[in-house]
Amino acid sequence: MRVIIAGGGTGGHIYPALAIAEGIKRRHPDADLLYVGTSRGLETEIVPRTGLPFHAIPAAGLKRGLSPTNLAAVLRAGRGLGASLSLMRRFRPQVVVGTGGYVCGPVVLAAALRGIKTLIHEQNALPGLTNRMLSRYASRTAVTFVEAAGHFPARARIILTGLPVRPEILNTRREQARRHLGIPDHAFVLLSFGGSRGARSLNQAMIPVVQAFREHPGVRLFHATGTAGYDEFAPLLKGTGSTAKAPGNIVVAPYFHEIAALLGAADLVICRSGASTIAELTALGLPSILVPYPFATGNHQEYNARALSERGAAVLILDRELTGQGLLAAVAALWNDPRKLAAMRQASKALGKPRALDSILDIIEKLAGKGTR
């Protein structure tokens, strides 16, 4: 099987692409894969480290309105389409997969023009502009959220697959995770994080939560500040009875390397609402308090969060409305209402798609004429 996978710009596009590549290799060890990105995105650092062959083409995103920047982007897109057409001729893929980012534009379009089967995958509840445009030409359009379907043209051939979740998270079990972390079965475990770089607003709002639950024998609280927020957060704990190292029931760190175990052990999670995070929460059936990143493209994180909150799987707090006392009240309300928490857990689990990767691989195999396992 010969497959080109394109996706770039951010980790949200790159990691799903890598998960798909790994899945193809597991099913078809002799498959020829080629990852296509740009020379400017994170993919230039991430992909080569995986051992996947990497090829860069010219590509750039368009902004609204007329500007010299847009003119340059159009010219670069034209060069990217030419490079992609040439690449299709040389590599001769059976299927081309796009996971988002403007690099997918010329790559998927070139494949469609050459009559090559294509699959695009949309991670968010509000699709990006590139995927909305490409869905007119793609053989199939896979979506993570059912809400995304209404934003695509009527002619798009949409399949609800979900978003691939890392095996170490899918395979985690509550009892094993708690045993590994030394957490008693009866403890209420609260996990909060704002992503690898953290979230200042979330860090600030967590102070009253730390104050309220410090040294509480029935609670274990884990808060990741992000690398940029740790030094700022640590002094804020002074006078709270806690420190950056924290008392026994509270752990504050820039980043948790054992996030899979922590998710497995958690009763409630406070976090942003990126697509990958949502996929992990729902795969494990975790209740959550979601605070969408307000500057995400098209405000897509709020759309993601609403997809859960409107089905009873999460509590939504907008970043502009986030306060320490408000967050504490939301946590306390759920902590004191096990029945509500159990209902949220069930609703979250119902939204999960733990077989997302297999569903996507099945589509690729069908498009390639290989059939399924």
UniProtKB/Swiss-Prot annotation:
Domain of life (superkingdom): Bacteria
Record's keyword annotation contains Zinc-finger: no
Keyword entries, A-Z: Cell cycle, Cell division, Cell membrane, Cell shape, Cell wall biogenesis/degradation, Glycosyltransferase, Membrane, Peptidoglycan synthesis, Transferase
GO annotations of cellular component type: plasma membrane
Pathway linked to the protein: Cell wall biogenesis; peptidoglycan biosynthesis
First-tier enzyme category under EC: transferase
Keyword Transport: no
Molecular-function annotations in GO: UDP-N-acetyl-D-glucosamine:N-acetylmuramoyl-L-alanyl-D-glutamyl-meso-2,6-diaminopimelyl-D-alanyl-D-alanine-diphosphoundecaprenol 4-beta-N-acetylglucosaminlytransferase activity; undecaprenyldiphospho-muramoylpentapeptide beta-N-acetylglucosaminyltransferase activity
Family statement drawn from the similarity comment of this UniProt entry: Belongs to the glycosyltransferase 28 family. MurG subfamily.
Function: Cell wall formation. Catalyzes the transfer of a GlcNAc subunit on undecaprenyl-pyrophosphoryl-MurNAc-pentapeptide (lipid intermediate I) to form undecaprenyl-pyrophosphoryl-MurNAc-(pentapeptide)GlcNAc (lipid intermediate II).
UniProt protein name: UDP-N-acetylglucosamine--N-acetylmuramyl-(pentapeptide) pyrophosphoryl-undecaprenol N-acetylglucosamine transferase
Organism: Desulforudis audaxviator (strain MP104C)
